[in-house]
Amino acid sequence: MYRVLLRPPAQKFLRKLRDKSLLARLMAAMRELAHQPRPPGCDKLAGPENLYRVRVGDYRVIYQVQDNALLVLVVKIGHRREVYR
């Protein structure tokens, strides 16, 4: 089982989130990453970093998998229009 850690931008997004049902869905998606870091439907993002994306409605969870440390590092969470900037 992998550990899931959140970087400060992801923590800040979750703290400011007012929609509790969305918060619950995001938390469930991140808990699932602990069991299966590359679930069906996740996409590897282009670029030099080893980043993946999982969709939760109109929101995206951007994360990095470190297999040697059994770690999933959530880099950013945001609306699909803003998360890639």
Identify the residue ranges that each predicted region occupies.
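Basic, Lys/Arg-enriched alpha-helical interface segments
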Residues: 1-53, 66-73, 82-85
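Active-site glycine-centered loops adjacent to acidic/histidine catalytic or metal-binding residues
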Residues: 79
